[in-house]
């Protein structure tokens, strides 16, 4: 109780001192209290808001959230059913090389028959499969132009054309698409529409389908469609095609003229439209798109608020105090577990304690590249050293003290035990009594580094073995407890502040010893993320640049198999292989804690891995009327 009183006092003091320096200093802090409209006041904690909204520009901060509200992908992924849910496109299916559907009833409108797909394509010498998609016929851009398959073709073609896009990430998104352009010149055609036809006539577009039907050729992998379907935001061709060139690339750090105008005035097909006149560096305002094609079951608007105002706060304390005082309705930022007990008992406060879908890992730099291939980090190339450090990590202690219990332990295979289909118990090699693990860890290190200094830390060439963990300052508690745990095996670690661009500054170029990374592996993303985490070494999630032939071969085999049972079996085996590398060491799977007020809106939905500011919440909100 004393701790809660102190925390509440700190919040009050911080709010009084810092509100004038927050992102909302020039806005009326009482606006929300007096507003009776269907406007959702949303707080966000960050250092700044973007001033431009090119959808592929950034994955940092609020930018991807706003982009995904203004623009749409082809589909969204439904984790409950394990299927792609309609969004811009209403249906898809695999077809054979004559264009005939490989579905359960041999029509274009039913689910894929995976056995038929396997039987057909396993016998073909071609290195690709064909996919048919069909768009909704009533999708419009926010400027009134109709969205057609030509917009999809343009977006994906641009993503393969680095000379025009200047976007390395887009090349990764389209890596499984058998299509390529270079400087607006077609190199390989792997997409077909009415205006970009298949000259062989195999993938023909029938009369009436010109705007809605197209075909892709993709690598022989069930995961090949993943990033095409739910990662690439579709761009309006009529907006970007006249502007983008090799001299005026889509992804620009210094946009000028017409390009800057388009960055600042996005034209999207999503459920929300940017209200430019009410948007600045401190507030982002989105209004509901009245012509959005997806509706609720009763025919009403899919989302239940008319406007969303996102307000910037520079720190969590100020944002939480603003929520408690009624200046905002909801936070689109996870809050520390320190606030859980404080907020749970407050009137008109809804606390979302959602299970996380990511596993926080301690990642080792196992294969540093020049010029950073020196120093203590080179010791991490020894798999036994990595194993010793992994054995010393005490997840239960971290969960109890860093997360205040709001989390769960994770397997070294990096897939949750709750995933009944994929979880492999034999990969859980870092569980068991911590005392026994410490004995084993010290035995390993005693053989390699028997000498210690006066503080009990191990020595290498006369110097204390010390590693820096590149991570956000918010992880100070985590690093402090890791210091205590690794001290028990004579290893010293300290925090190195990650800054605002850790990937560019440290991680991509090997300028680090260890880092903290969230890993999410699932049936939906296995093809993409196993490769990103454990194979690709350039600008990928494989920060430590691990290269293991057996692991790489098994990942490639998993990606290429068209038999679902064999694919699942290989994912089980991959968990064992990745665990045995002692490369990404599980720390915990933390819950996502977030908060909202219930005096203006109710109907908040707790969604795994997300804050309470999520799509399902926006679909279910009910405005409170009366006193």
Language model: regions and residue ranges:
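N-terminal lobe/hinge region of extracytoplasmic solute-binding protein
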Residues: 43-123, 267
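Ligand-site clamp/hinge motif
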Residues: 258-263, 292-342, 492-494, 499
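Structural transition elements
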Residues: 272, 408-453, 471-476
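Gly/Pro-rich hinge or "lid" segments in bacterial periplasmic/extracellular proteins
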Residues: 78-80, 230-302, 307, 438-439, ...
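Surface-exposed binding/hinge segments that line
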Residues: 169-249
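Aromatic- and charge-enriched surface segment that lines or borders ligand/interaction sites
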Residues: 92-173, 378-381, 386-388
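Detector for C-terminal structural segments
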Residues: 283, 360, 390-427, 474-483, ...
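Extracellular/periplasmic solute-recognition and catalytic clefts
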Residues: 43-46, 165-169, 275-287, 311-372, ...
């Amino acid at each position: 109780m004393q701790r809660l009183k102190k925390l509440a006092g700190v919040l009050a003091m911080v709010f009084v001192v810092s509100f004038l320096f927050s992102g909302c200093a020039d806005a009326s802090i009482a606006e929300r209290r007096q507003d009776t409209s269907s406007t959702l006041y949303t707080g966000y904690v960050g250092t700044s808001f973007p001033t431009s909204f090119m959808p592929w520009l950034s994955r940092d901060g609020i930018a991807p959230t706003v982009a995904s509200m203004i623009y749409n992908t082809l589909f969204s992924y439904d984790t409950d059913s394990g299927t792609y849910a309609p969004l811009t496109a209403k249906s898809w299916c695999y077809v054979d090389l004559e264009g005939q559907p490989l579905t359960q009833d041999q029509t274009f409108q039913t689910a894929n028959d995976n056995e038929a797909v396997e039987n057909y394509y396993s016998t073909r010498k071609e290195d690709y499969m064909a996919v048919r998609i069909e768009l909704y016929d009533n999708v419009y851009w926010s400027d009134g132009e109709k969205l057609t398959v030509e917009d999809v073709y343009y977006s994906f073609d641009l993503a393969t054309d680095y000379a025009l896009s200047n976007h390395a990430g887009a090349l990764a998104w389209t890596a499984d698409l058998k299509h390529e352009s270079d400087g607006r010149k077609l190199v390989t055609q792997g997409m077909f529409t009415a205006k970009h036809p298949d000259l062989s006539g195999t993938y023909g577009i029938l009369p009436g389908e010109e705007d809605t039907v197209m075909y892709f050729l993709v690598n022989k992998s069930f995961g090949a469609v993943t990033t095409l379907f739910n990662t690439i935001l579709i761009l309006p061709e009529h907006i970007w095609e006249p502007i983008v060139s090799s001299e005026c690339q889509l992804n620009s750090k210094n946009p000028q003229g017409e390009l800057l105008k388009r960055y600042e005035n996005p034209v999207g097909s999503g459920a929300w439209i940017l209200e430019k006149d009410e948007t600045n560096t401190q507030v982002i305002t989105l209004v509901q798109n009245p012509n959005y094609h997806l509706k609720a079951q009763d025919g009403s608007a899919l989302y239940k608020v008319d406007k969303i105002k996102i307000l910037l706060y520079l720190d969590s304390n100020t944002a939480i105090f603003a929520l408690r005082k009624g200046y905002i309705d909801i936070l689109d930022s996870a809050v520390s577990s320190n606030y859980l007990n404080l907020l749970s008992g407050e009137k008109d406060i809804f606390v979302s304690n959602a299970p996380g879908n990511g596993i926080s890992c301690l990642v080792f730099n196992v294969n540093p590249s020049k010029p950073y291939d020196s120093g203590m980090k080179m010791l991490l190339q020894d798999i036994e050293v990595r194993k010793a450090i992994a054995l010393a990590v005490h997840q239960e202690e971290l969960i109890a003290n860093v997360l205040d219990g709001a989390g769960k332990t994770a397997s070294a295979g990096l897939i949750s035990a709750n995933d009944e289909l994929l979880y492999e118990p034999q990969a859980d090699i870092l569980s068991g009594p911590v005392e026994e693990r410490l004995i084993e860890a010290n035995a390993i290190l005693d053989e390699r580094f028997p000498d210690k200094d006066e503080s009990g830390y191990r020595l290498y060439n006369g110097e204390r073995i010390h590693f820096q963990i590149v991570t956000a300052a918010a992880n100070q508690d985590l690093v402090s407890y890791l210091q205590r745990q690794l001290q028990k095996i004579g290893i010293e670690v300290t925090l190195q502040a990650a800054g605002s661009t850790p990937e560019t500054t440290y991680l991509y170029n090997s300028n680090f010893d260890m880092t903290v990374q969230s890993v999410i592996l699932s049936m939906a993303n296995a093809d993409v993320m196993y490769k990103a985490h454990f194979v690709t070494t350039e600008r990928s999630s494989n920060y430590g640049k691990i290269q293991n032939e057996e692991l790489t071969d098994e990942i490639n085999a998993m990606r290429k198999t068209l038999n679902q049972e064999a694919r699942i079996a290989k994912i089980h085996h991959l968990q064992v292989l990745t665990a045995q590398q002692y490369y990404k060491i599980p720390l915990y799977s933390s819950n996502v804690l977030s908060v909202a007020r219930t005096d203006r809106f109710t109907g908040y939905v707790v969604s795994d891995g997300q804050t309470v500011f999520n799509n399902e919440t926006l679909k279910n909100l009910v405005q409170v009327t009366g006193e």
